[in-house]
Curated annotation (Swiss-Prot):
Outcome of substituting N388C: Affects 5-formyltetrahydrofolate transporter activity
Region feature (Disordered): 441-461
Source species, domain of life: Bacteria
Native source species: Synechocystis sp. (strain ATCC 27184 / PCC 6803 / Kazusa)
Taxonomic placement: Bacteria, Bacillati, Cyanobacteriota, Cyanophyceae, Synechococcales
Role of this protein: Mediates folate monoglutamate transport involved in tetrahydrofolate biosynthesis. It also mediates transport of antifolates, such as methotrexate and aminopterin.
Effect seen on changing D93C: Affects 5-formyltetrahydrofolate transporter activity
Cellular compartments annotated: Cell membrane
GO cellular component terms, A-Z: plasma membrane
Name of the featured protein: Folate-biopterin transporter
Pfam families: BT1
């Protein structure tokens, strides 16, 4: 009786055999708590925000009349706030709002996000205005993302290496479930409502983040014994990024992410040339959301213990080669094989989503395992911002290639060449796989320290860590303040 009284309500719910099964299998061994529920809720909301993905794409294409190159450039610039994640992380670590470092920023994120979608619904009428609101909405999601990242990293620091991947797979799943719920609706709603109405509906969901923030377990800054100092944080981060175990993998990931994307051009091809309707594109989103879960499951079950170099090398090669299957659709070779455009696109999207998900999971694990305690939000945000910068470059370079090759709203003669260039370019970083650690960098650092206790060396002894970034191939992927650009830059699928 005393034991039951000492348990939290949510823990009691997981005390029966069935609930224990759900804890071990559904929560992947993570202990249930209100804070975990809040974290999963925030990622779930970010998945739900995919409701507006197709609406934004069609709004920019049809109502604002942007060209493929212009859309790509606008989307890339709209993602610029994600480059500021270190600043946002530093602010959350050192500058509390209303007495809190995490809750208050989640409140701000939710309110800004809702306001941004309302502006889309009622105000935006030009490319310039769209760019400004994209920046604003992007900033709102970036704020929430860096905060929830820090919460997950703080929890992950307490986990053993044996459980690496479990929490990030769980949060991946939460976002994917949100995406699945709204995937089909994202296209179906456009059959019934205008894009602006869809934006107004989307404005409701960021408010759920505001509610979830109240479940975060956080001590008020007024009760803190030690106050974080910005200068001290910056010094710690600078010391960390100078270590080869952090710097070299970051350089590789940057080069890997910065290869060009052809997604905007391919979106125009599927809608203007192939005649894909919003309803069908919603179905594609539905099956790819499920495929994303399959990719996470495969990584969690079979691949999470593979060395970084092995999984990154093979997944990059396989993703690049499979991405070339898009040429079959572009050249209409599938029709000669008796396969309808819709069915081929659907099957191709499933395969490419699974491989893309598997390719990016080890990047997230590696990034999080490089985060020392005390500066989790700031350093992880710095690593993600480098990836985001590479993602912006990827889209901007892709837009330039689209323009140079003369791919427009109706001219797709050079689209096949564009897809070949973007896919094969993903192989360019492979000669630099040696920049990645051969094994777990934390284990290696610890071993070296034990062998040379008096030698400070140039490495940090880092604690176990893992984290979720709800991105697939491309650091900006699946950011649902915009169309899902970047997730398929190697595949260039819709």
């Amino acid at each position: 009786m005393l034991v039951a009284m000492s348990m939290t309500p949510i823990a009691i719910l997981f005390s029966t055999p069935l609930k224990r099964f759900l804890r071990e299998k559904v929560l992947l061994g993570n202990a249930p708590s209100w804070e975990l529920l809040a974290i999963l809720s925030i990622y779930f909301v970010q998945g739900v925000l995919g409701l507006s993905r197709l609406a934004v794409s069609f709004f920019l294409k049809d109502e604002l009349g942007l060209s493929p190159a212009a859309m790509g450039a606008l989307i890339g610039l709209g993602a610029a706030p994600w480059i500021l994640k270190p600043v946002l992380g530093l602010m959350s670590d050192t500058v509390p709002l209303f007495g809190y470092r995490r809750r208050s920023y989640l409140w701000l994120s939710g309110l800004m996000g809702s306001a941004g979608w309302l502006l889309f619904a009622a105000w935006v009428s030009s490319g310039t205005q769209a760019g400004l609101v994209l920046l604003f909405t992007s900033l709102s999601v970036a704020i929430g993302d860096v905060i929830v990242d820090s919460l997950v990293v703080e929890r992950a620091q307490r986990e053993s290496l044996a459980q690496v991947g479990s929490l990030q797979s769980l949060t991946w799943g939460a976002a994917a479930v949100g995406g699945i719920i709204t995937a089909y609706a994202s296209g179906a709603l456009l059959e019934w409502f205008s894009t602006r109405t869809v934006f107004a509906i989307t404005a409701i969901f960021p408010l759920l983040t505001v509610g979830a923030a109240f479940l975060i377990s956080e001590v008020s800054t007024a009760e803190e014994e030690e106050k974080p100092q910005p200068k001290a944080q910056i010094k710690l981060v600078w010391q960390a990024v100078r270590q080869k175990t952090i710097l070299l993998p970051t350089l590789f990931i940057f080069f890997w992410q910065a290869t060009p994307s052809a997604e905007s051009a391919f979106f125009y091809f599927t809608t203007n040339e192939l005649g894909f309707e919003p309803k069908f594109l919603g179905r594609v989103r539905l099956v790819t959301s499920v495929a994303g879960l399959i990719g996470v499951g495969l990584y969690q079950r079979f691949l999470k213990t593979l060395p970084f170099r092995v999984i990154m090398g093979w997944s990059t090669v396989i993703s690049s080669l499979l991405g070339l299957t898009t040429l079959i659709l572009i050249t209409h070779a599938n029709r000669a094989m008796g396969i309808d455009d819709h069915w081929f696109s659907l099957g191709d999207s499933i395969i490419l989503t699974v491989t893309g998900q598997i390719a990016f999971m080890p990047v997230l694990v590696l990034a999080a395992r490089l985060c020392p305690p005390g500066i989790e939000a700031t350093l992880f945000a710095l690593l993600m911002s480098v990836m985001n910068l590479a993602g912006v470059l990827s889209f901007e370079v892709g837009s330039l290639l689209t323009h140079w090759l003369g791919v427009t709203e109706t001219q797709f003669d050079n689209l096949a060449l564009l897809v070949i260039i973007t896919n094969l370019s993903t192989l360019l970083p492979l000669p630099f796989l040696g920049l990645l650690p051969a094994g777990d960098p934390q284990v290696k650092d610890k071993t070296e320290k034990e062998d040379n206790p008096d030698d400070p060396g140039d490495r940090l002894v880092l604690p176990p860590a893992e984290v979720f970034e709800h991105h697939t191939v491309g650091s900006l992927s699946d950011q649902n303040f915009l169309p899902e650009f970047f997730p398929e830059k190697s595949s260039s699928r819709p």
